[in-house]
Amino acid sequence: MLNRSVYELAGGERTFKLMVERFYARVAKDPVLRSVYPEEDLSGATERLTLFLIQYWGGPATYSERRGHPRLRLRHQPFAIGHLERDAWLSHMTAAVESLDLAPAVRTALLDYFETASTAMINQPVRS
């Protein structure tokens, strides 16, 4: 068990696909976040995030094979991401993670990562 990746422990590709589908179902209805996603159809964003998370957590490196290095900050720089957007994003991702039947250690690893990563994407000053 100690040698298994979070990808494997979470249930593999199926789990990550489901998590991302649930996340984007919420994003699609969120007026704060829709402006961050320029595509009307979120299927491209869904595929990219799924592939990224699968790779990040120890699954196949399909994301890098197709898109190169993730460069998260650079890829998100064109979009205005402030604390409001970060909080909305994290709320939807937390709900998606918590909707899954995951071991507590896996859930904690995912949520800790999403909190850190989403905070790192903030590129706008605090609004007064």
Predicted regions and their residues:
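Core of compact, soluble alpha-helical bundle domains
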Residues: 1-128
